Amino acid sequence: MAAKDVKFGNDARVKMLAGVNVLADAVKVTLGPKGRNVILDKSFGAPTITKDGVSVAREIELEDKFENMGAQMVKEVASKANDAAGDGTTTATVLAQAIVNEGLKAVAAGMNPMDLKRGIDKAVAAVVSELKALSKPCETSKEIEQVGTISANSDSIVGQLIAQAMEKVGKEGVITVEDGTGLEDELDVVEGMQFDRGYLSPYFINKPETATVEMDNPYILLVDKKISNIRELLPVLEAVAKAGKPLLIIAEDVEGEALATLVVNTMRGIVKVAAVKAPGFGDRRKAMLQDIAILTAGTVISEEIGMELEKAALEDLGQAKRVVINKDNTTIIDGVGDEAQIKGRVAQIRQQIEESTSDYDKEKLQERVAKLAGGVAVIKVGAATEVEMKEKKDRVEDALHATRAAVEEGIVAGGGVALIRAASKAAANLQGDNEEQNVGIKLALRAMEAPLRQIVANAGEEASVVASAVKNGEGNYGYNAGTEEYGDMIAMGILDPTKVTRSALQFAASIAGLMITTEAMVTELPKDDKLDPSAAMGGMGGMGGMM
């Protein structure tokens, strides 16, 4: 086991604080409408330019191991805020730095760290409940656009695109961000349920100009097995032919004689059929077939529940207004499923999302919710260079997370104002169990001014003057650093999602409290692997006369 280096008390805290400040100082220059960029060197390819706090934090590793421990703990604050709300990483870092700096000053003055931490925790709990009281629901498209614009660093086009996307696919719909091909940002919307399986034979195509299969008011047969024997399908095919409607077959696979017969019947015009493979694999495929069944008011023909394909009747088939199939995707538009059943299924999947521990599973479950709830929107980010594209994509993803958070928990006044208002309301009723807890409460409430001060400092104004003016105001009165004006922040469209502000404060206080109560730090001593240069050159003494 390697030897360890141990530091105690003030020595440890000084080192830790130095690390905290290096990381936080690099991150906080990005805060606010006039925040600057940070350039990150990459071991390969062009450097990355970003205004995303968590991207900056993730890049920082310090040479001094004790300082690095401090930096890594603040990095954890940014990462946690990013995971919880998808935004607010810079705010969380600024708050953590302020609480740690104030807290360690109090510890150095002889205060009890545990009581300070208890005071900080009390202050944060009170401020969080005040934030919830200040919060108002984010319902209109205009508010969603404003939240998106602020989070994308005042890029109004991004805000508009996100608002349009949410309007089209609903607040539950999936919105993804992809690289565009031109200079302009674009929005593509896929309505209905789309899954990544195309037609099993190009002979099903009935729209040669677009190489697609299009069906109006089709029946949809859902089968949880491979179909290779046409005899199993004949009763359903005859019933559908009599009804005079097209048929879409979604099965594990359709092959051999069965596929050949379907193709021949389609080409002769006897019955209009198309077949696609069911999406997903294993249990996920079964779940997705069930989703499609609920969406189209059909039944999955599965031998597991004693159903046989030969005995399937028209009432077992699902229906939709329209189906479009190309070589890669199938889209079912306007399934006739019962609204209450669809909502019940969505609620069931949401419960699974809550219980799931895997990010991959959560993402797949979220996709299923979106497909049931209304559609998928793709924002294609346009830029002149790849470096700009990466930077812009980061901002769009941040804005998207922020708008989702706003829809979930509502919005508060932005620009650091909500924290100041919540802190002043909380201060009126807060009392610690002893004087040292009161000091903890006061330092936490004082630290909550830090985001506003940093936004103002980044805009080149005097932070103390603006902070004093905002504190003396009421309600949503604050300072718009973009236009350098005072006024009603919500009326000016400067909004923050409540969830982002709340998460930033809670994670910052949690990690800062742990750092304030640190009394010793342990790290490995560096290994001394370097050779002694004089020993390495010892055998070359006879070369002296050659110079």
From Swiss-Prot:
InterPro entries: Chaperonin_Cpn60_CS, Cpn60/GroEL, Cpn60/GroEL/TCP-1, GroEL-like_apical_dom_sf, GROEL-like_equatorial_sf, TCP-1-like_intermed_sf. Its EC number is 5.6.1.7. Keywords: ATP-binding, Chaperone, Cytoplasm, Isomerase, Nucleotide-binding. It catalyses: ATP + H2O + a folded polypeptide = ADP + phosphate + an unfolded polypeptide. PROSITE patterns: CHAPERONINS_CPN60. It is found in: Cytoplasm. The keyword Isomerase applies. GO terms for molecular function: ATP binding; ATP-dependent protein folding chaperone; isomerase activity; unfolded protein binding. Coiled coil: none annotated. The keyword Cytoplasm applies. ATP binds at residues 30-33, 51, 87-91, 415, 496. One of its GO terms (cellular component) is cytoplasm. Transmembrane segments: none annotated. One of its GO terms (biological process) is protein refolding. Forms a cylinder of 14 subunits composed of two heptameric rings stacked back-to-back. Interacts with the co-chaperonin GroES. Belongs to the chaperonin (HSP60) family. Together with its co-chaperonin GroES, plays an essential role in assisting protein folding. The GroEL-GroES system forms a nano-cage that allows encapsulation of the non-native substrate proteins and provides a physical environment optimized to promote and accelerate protein folding. This is Chaperonin GroEL.
